[in-house]
Design a protein with these regions (language model features):
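N-terminal "domain-start" segment that seeds a small globular fold
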Residues: 1-9
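Hydrophobic "anchor" residues
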Residues: 6, 112-113
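Short active-site neighborhood of thiol/selenol oxidoreductases, capturing the structured segment around
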Residues: 8-31, 37, 50-55
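Short hydrophobic alpha-helix segments
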Residues: 10, 115-118
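A short acidic/small-residue loop/turn micro-motif
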Residues: 14, 120-123
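Loop/turn elements at helix/coil->beta-strand transitions in domains of secreted/extracellular proteins
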Residues: 14-18, 45-52, 76-81, 109-112
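Structural microenvironment flanking redox-active thiols in thiol-disulfide oxidoreductases
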Residues: 31-75, 87-92
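Short, internal strand/loop/helix patches
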Residues: 67-105, 109-110, 118
Length: 127
């Protein structure tokens, strides 16, 4: 993850559902929703789930991308887990094909995408 901890696909099996949010540092709508996503993660944790962020500027361990992402997360009060991976993995190829940000997907315990991706910011005021 962005904090230097090892992560593998077992993180999905630990959760009833994992919400994965793809974002990047220069995306204003992405950064604007970081604090709301942190609130969503707290709600999900109470229901056996987790929200995970994937900043596409951190792929392959891009140090400057990671440093900037960590600053943005801290400035927005977002402490939920953010991970990166190599761009030549299945997840890396998926991230590389995203054309609209933020994009959010649901992952089941087996690491499968459930339903269609949600494009755009998450509005939690309607819940």
């Amino acid at each position: 993850d962005l904090e230097g901890n090892d992560v593998d696909y077992s993180l999905f099996s630990a959760n009833a559902v994992t919400v994965v949010n793809f974002w990047f540092n220069g995306c204003k709508p992405c950064v604007a929703e970081l604090s709301k996503l942190n609130e969503l993660n707290e709600t999900l944790k109470g229901m056996g789930g987790e929200l995970i962020g994937i900043n596409t500027e951190t792929l392959d361990g891009n140090k400057s991308g990671i440093e900037e992402a960590l600053k943005l997360l801290e400035s927005q009060g977002a402490s939920y887990r953010n991970i990166y991976f190599d761009s030549d993995t299945e997840a890396g190829r998926y991230a590389g094909n995203i054309m609209a940000f933020p994009t959010t997907i649901l992952i089941d315990r087996n690491g499968n995408i459930v339903g269609e991706p949600f494009l755009g910011g998450i509005d939690m005021t309607s819940s």
